[in-house]
Amino acid sequence: MADRELFYLTHAGLTAWRWHDAAVHELARFTDGEAGIDAFSAHLAQHPQARCTLVADLADEAFHLETLPLLRGRDRRHLIARRQAQLHLDTPYVAHQSLGRDSGNPRSERLLIAALTRPPSLRPWLAAIAQAPTVLTGIHSTALLGMAVQRQLRPRPPRALLVHTTPAGLRISCFEHDLLRFSRLVPGLSPSTVGFWQSCRDEILRTSQYLIGQRALERGGATPVQVLAHPDQHAILRAACPDSPDLRFIPLDLPELARRCGLRSPPDSSDSLPLLLHLAV
């Protein structure tokens, strides 16, 4: 596969990465604001005809679980478009995925509608790309890329939380049969922060209580919490995150998982960004 450029977007700015021969390498960083946009435009001019992908890691997200009549083809597309319009998401950055038939009504389909709800966070960067001789192949969110991670895990319980860190912060996602139900980014949390894993546990507990209230998780169900982390953090993680009747914490070897996914430059820390970028190609 040809080289790719991957543009990783957070509220702090954008980082350009190159994917080559199943390895990712950071190229440059651009801060949020006019100076950063200008520098990014200059970078694009130096890489004409590059094929690129934008990966957004933003807290401004919305997830709506809908139950719709089971339709096919054009009728289904029109129904989904109409439902998205009724949600008044006020953003062009919307995706949907089927969660399968409703177990209580086989003539209905469960649908997750996901949206990036703050278009100004993306607009100036996308405008710079549009003005350059660059081919934008797609826009991904780290929340939806989590599904590709989840499918690589063994074993895969029917319901689980997936927890990982990126430069944007801590992300907690809920999966049901490998399909995303909910995702939340906690900005600013980093493994380099003092007391990080205790803060991580607090945020996971807060998220799980919300999901129990939404009936996405069962109270007292010992839901597996699969935490991607470097092995040198596993002992600290276990000490800070004891199991409870609601949650069962499972540290996962992030570098080993990255190698299993085919990444030839596995992370040397608990930062899952290199793996997510690889999965976006």
Language model regions located:
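Hydrophobic/aromatic-enriched cytosolic interaction surfaces used to assemble or bind macromolecules
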Residues: M1-V281
